[in-house]
Amino acid sequence: MGFLKFSPFLVVSILLLYQACGLQAVPLRSTLESSPGMATLSEEEARLLAALVQNYMQMKVRELEQEEEQEAEGSSLDSPRSKRCGNLSTCMLGTYTQDLNKFHTFPQTSIGVGAPGKKRDMAKDLETNHHPYFGN
């Protein structure tokens, strides 16, 4: 009775093992020799590949030229500044002053120690209730 339960499993496993043994990881040498060379390209494919490579190289050259132009424009913009700032400390001081000014002009957020909140509002209410004569 137990043999009948395992017989389909046995048949399937034997078939799988037979198929696994039949498959080979490396193809036969005759199939490699009979197939046309995969590495060889036709004349049209070679021309297309050469055109693609040439277009890619031209695109990269244009990108590099644009980057060089942008760098040249950037250095020309900085040249009056370099003429004005003969001393490095003067330039750095000016830069830090500008950054500090930008920092102070940012809008204030309601986060942090001095932020308005429930506790501060309650404290103000207590002060106004304890000293009613200061309010008016």
Swiss-Prot record:
Modified residues (Proline amide): 116
Glycosylation sites: 87
One BP term from GO: positive regulation of interleukin-1 alpha production
GO cellular component, one term: extracellular space
Residues recorded as bearing Phosphoserine in the entry: 42
InterPro entries in the record: Calcitonin, Calcitonin-like, Calcitonin/adrenomedullin, Calcitonin_CS, Calcitonin_peptide-like
Main localisation: secreted
Keywords per UniProt: Amidation, Cleavage on pair of basic residues, Disulfide bond, Glycoprotein, Hormone, Phosphoprotein, Secreted, Signal
SMART domains attached to this UniProt entry: CALCITONIN
PROSITE patterns in the record: CALCITONIN
Entry keyword annotation includes Signal: yes
Example GO molecular function: protein-containing complex binding
Coiled coil: none
Residue numbers covered by the propeptide annotation in the UniProt entry: 26-82, 121-136
Span list, region Disordered: 64-84, 114-136
Signal peptide: 1-25
Cysteine pairings via disulfide bonds: 85-91
Localization of this protein: Secreted
Comp. bias regions, Basic and acidic residues: 118-130
PANTHER family: CALCITONIN, CALCITONIN-RELATED
Entry function: Calcitonin is a peptide hormone that causes a rapid but short-lived drop in the level of calcium and phosphate in blood by promoting the incorporation of those ions in the bones. Calcitonin function is mediated by the calcitonin receptor/CALCR and the CALCR-RAMP2 (AMYR2) receptor complex.
Family: Belongs to the calcitonin family.
Protein name (database record): Calcitonin
